[in-house]
Amino acid sequence: MEQDELLHQLVDPKSPINIESLLDTITALVNDCKIPVLMRMKSVDNFISRYERIVESVAALRMKATDFRQLKVIGRGAFGEVHLVRHTRTNTVYAMKMLNKDDMIKRADSAFFWEERDIMAHANSEWIVRLQYAFQDPRHLYMVMEYMPGGDLVNLMTSYEVSEKWTRFYTAEIVEALAALHNMGYIHRDVKPDNMLISRSGHIKLADFGTCVKMNSNGVVRCSTAVGTPDYISPEVLRNQGKDSEFGKEVDWWSVGVFIYEMLVGETPFYAEALVSTYANIMNHQTSLRFPDEPLISTQAKDIIKKFLSAAPERLGKNNVDEIRNHKFFKNDEWTFETLKDATPPIVPSLKSDDDTTHFEEIETRDRDNASDFQLPKTFNGNQLPFIGFTYSNEYSPVKKLLNGASSNGVQNGVENKPVVVQQPLTNGHSTGIPEEQYEEVVIELDSKKRELESLKDSISRTEIRAKLIETEKNSLSSKINDLERELKDNKERLRLGADSDTKVNELSVELRMSKEYNGEMENELSKFRDKCEQLKEDLRKKSGELAQEKNETQRVLQQKKNAEEAFAEIKRDHEMLQTREAEKSLQLKKALDERKENGAYQQSVAKATDAEWERKMQYYEKQLEQATDDRKREEQKRTAAEFDQSRVARKLAGIEANYELLQNDYTNMKEARKDLERDLQDVIAEKRRLEIRVEQLMDSRNTDERVLNLCQEELLESQEEAKYKEDGLRGKIDGIRNELENEKMKSQTLEENLIVADKERGMLKMEVQELMQRHKWEMANKEQNLKHIENQLEELKEHSRIESTEQESNDKKTIADLNKKLELEKAHKKAVINKLEEEMAKRQPLKKGDKGITKSALIKKEREIVGFKKCRTGRILMSLQQENQHLQQKMTEMYMDSEKQGEHFSYQMQEMSQLIETLRDELKEYKDEYPQRHSVNRYEDKRSLDSREGIPTSISHQNIQIDGWLSLRDMTKKSRKPKVVFKKKSDHQLTLFFQWTNYFVILNEYAFTIYTDEKHLNSVVLTIEAGAMAHVRHVTSADLRNVDDNQLPKIFHIMYDDTSSNSSRHASNSDLSICEPREEGWKRHDFQELSYHTRTYCDDCGKKLSDFIRPTPAFECKNCHYKTHKEHIAQGTITMCRYTGLSRELVLMGTHKEVCNQWVSQLRRFIEASRPANVSVSRVSSRRHVGGPGSSA
């Protein structure tokens, strides 16, 4: 029983100790232990020596990447690529995913491939992509899956208008796929159209199980990170990121609801430009879920979407999948869930061949990066251990070969991708005299000898490589010795010049000693190689003797074959003699019959007995003849088999002889190389001795030079001390006199410079104040004149509007009265005509002479005709009257709407003029209030320096701020369910929305930031942001604008400004979705929300990265000003104050180039900083211009 249980675990593909896993284990151990540091240990070296060749032979027989011919790259991800491949043996087309082991080991959460491999390998469902093979090499993992030539649903959504009927069909299939996945105990967590592939028949299958996680016994998962695509992630997963939480399979049903909405509407239900806004919409899904007016969506579709996109406890499908299958949305007359797999899909992909890739995007082929191999470790690190047990085969493997062989009572050897077929001997030894067992032993021994020769050849080649390495080391050592000699010469020269070279000489001595030690090590290694070469030579002699024995054995086999042929010839001669005897017996029988006929009836009785005897003899000879014929056929077969064996043995002998000659040549070459190495080594030894003598000479000369140098240095120090003592005395006297002269000179220069600067400052200040007063007087006069002109225009517009409205009302009343009169006259006329007609029809004509009287039946018939005619005529007249009435009412409605539009237009113009007048009045009042202050400056101009600018307006302090140009504008605060978008497809198969940008001409000066519609028409202002209203400017990141082209992102910047004229409640947040509650005082007015960034994003506080593909750092983002920071900065209190005031508005602008964007951001920051500190400067914040712009009304 125990043996049966062990055998069952060995052949079970789901068992962790099956045969494939054991082969993976021994391969991984050999690869991880085969490093120089570990091979110094005797036990590891013995292990590698025993199993290295076995592992290499097993790897050559198992499935590998070269068994598939790569056709095209059809997908690329973070860990690897997906290739379209064709199996070289069966010509079947597959999709092969190739994953890099090194990348997966570096990532913390990279064990996703186990779930993906197990689900696809063991899923028994037609709705899940099937795994055919899984194998590995030291660098990569390979998963060979069935090819889905129809592409994904994203490609279908971009190519066709998806109807509700199509949505129903594809939703039913994805429900079946998720039901199968949940029954296996897994949750997908990333259900989206990108992971739904279309098969050759048009049905879809679920794929990409890298995000799957195993449920526990309660059907839930405990996780602390939010995994999935932002647009499809459920609120319970998003709410609990950063802390452990439990959720079940209902998270997949949420994604199905988003998928149905996207199929019907064309975009996801909670989409927003910024990632934080998307998360906010998901968290507040009760109010943010809305259905557009176009396209029309049925009540059943809306109901199932609402039930999917609901709270987790109430979500459809939480209890079981039958709740979903029984929903009214899936009711139709074409298919049911039982017949779904046999139903006709809406679209069957058109394919030109089995490897057609027209439904996939073109992906650029990359060269493989050889630098991504595992670095050579310094100790055992087990790089291959995490991948033990990954190998799998759905078609054939050693396990299935064993099972199939056991069922047929004959175990056949097989390997995963190259099954070995053992050819049975063609003879059984009866004809040649060689026993079958002995013949098989000869063949096996020949194969083993061949393998030993090959291994010997490999060892010789490795020895040759090591000899070349020794040669290289010798050359490097020679060059190093030459360098040391040159360095010694240089140091000697430096000694003569007085440089301190003791340290250098010591270092050279140490290096020379190290080189001697290294040379000794090389000599020892060379001696080891000599011993190994001698050992290899001895092995070669043994192998030669064994080869000679094999030749003798082969000759013996040939001699036995010759004897067999001679025996066959003798049997053939015996057969010919039997044929001759048979012919003679036939002639004797014929003669006896003739004699019997001549003798007559007398001898008939005797003849009968003779005939019976002859018949028995004839039967006996016929049997002997048949037996001889069979023997001859068997001998023929044996001879043919012996000839075949002879040719096979001859071929093997020829191969062995050729290998032997090659081995002899290699051995000769190796001997010559060894002699060359010995000669080179002698040269190196001689050179080393010469260098040692040279170094000793140099050391002696260095010691002599050191003694001479020390004497010189002592004398030089004495003379230097005497000269320094005298120099110090003279220098002190000279410095005192020089300092006195310089002090006097500096005092006089300072007084002169101060006098000149004061005069210049006084003159410049006087000119600036006079110029400022003149300019403001001129501006005040222009403002007053403009104000009067605008007031006159306003009065004229009011009068004109009043007159036009009065005239229009009178005209409308008159027109309505005329139309009513016409309607009454027409009704009276029609009524009179109808009455006249009825009267004429109702009249009865008098009888003429000769006419018969009208019968009662004819009278009834006539009355019926009159009634029918009257009804028909009345109906037509009433219909025409109704149509005419509707036409008149429609005309009156249009006239009334035109009058209302004109009234609204006039009122809008009047409102704009009123606002402009109020603005001008405010500015005029400010100038009037400021005029006395400027006038008072003139009285104290002689007491002020150039740096005291409290009374000068802000425009002077930053008058060099001037920039203009074309920018593309898009408003972030504009809400629209159907934005103007262009759909594109990225390399990761994601449907992306790229917004259209509108070009405007923008001017920034010392007063305001103004946006115009055109460069030539500067009077058409779109938006004006004045100096005090500008709050914040920054560059955007991919987290702010997710669906923007990567090339456009560096050219975009974000502006925040105040809008006091707008209602603050309109800008308030409709929901508070901050996960970290309650708010802390250290947030500095920010409304933070904790997020995880998977795209490239940086901290606004320290500038370091916030993002990571798998496990990003904890981060916060303000929902108002989009300030991003690390979590620890909030605790440290280093964050800046939020610039959002509750009345702030936002703009997103894009420059033509990255440099243009940087220039605008730099100038705007100067503009903001310059407008803040002015205490007595001209305040322009109150004079807001409420001019409508694209998406804003600043």
Curated annotation (Swiss-Prot):
Q: Which reaction does it catalyse?
A: L-seryl-[protein] + ATP = O-phospho-L-seryl-[protein] + ADP + H(+); L-threonyl-[protein] + ATP = O-phospho-L-threonyl-[protein] + ADP + H(+)
Similarity comment text for this entry? Belongs to the protein kinase superfamily. AGC Ser/Thr protein kinase family.
Annotated binding of ATP, by residue: 74-82, 97
Q: Cross-referenced Pfam families, in alphabetical order?
A: Pkinase
Quaternary arrangement and interactors, per the entry? Interacts with rho-1.
Q: Which GO terms describe its molecular function?
A: ATP binding; protein serine kinase activity; Rho-dependent protein serine/threonine kinase activity; small GTPase binding; zinc ion binding
Q: Which gene encodes it?
A: let-502
Q: What is its EC number?
A: 2.7.11.1
GO biological process: what's one of them? Answer: embryonic morphogenesis
Query: Any idea which UniProt keywords this protein has?
Result: ATP-binding, Coiled coil, Cytoplasm, Cytoskeleton, Developmental protein, Differentiation, Kinase, Magnesium, Metal-binding, Nucleotide-binding, Oogenesis, Phosphoprotein, Serine/threonine-protein kinase, Transferase, Zinc, Zinc-finger
Q: Where are the zinc fingers (Phorbol-ester/DAG-type)?
A: 1085-1138
Q: What does this protein do?
A: Negatively regulates mel-11 to relieve the inhibition of mlc-4, allowing contraction of the circumferentially oriented microfilaments in epidermal cells and thereby regulating myosin II contractility during spermathecal contraction, cleavage furrow contraction in early embryos, and embryonic elongation and morphogenesis. Required for P-cell migration. May also play a role in oocyte cellularization.
What is the protein's name according to its record?
Rho-associated protein kinase let-502
Cellular localisation: Cytoplasm; Cytoplasm, Cytoskeleton; Cleavage furrow
Active site residues of this protein? 190
Q: Which residues form the PH domain?
A: 961-1171
Q: Where is the Protein kinase domain?
A: 68-330
Q: Where is the RhoBD domain?
A: 784-846
The keyword Metal-binding is annotated on this UniProt entry: yes
Broad class of enzyme this protein falls into: transferase
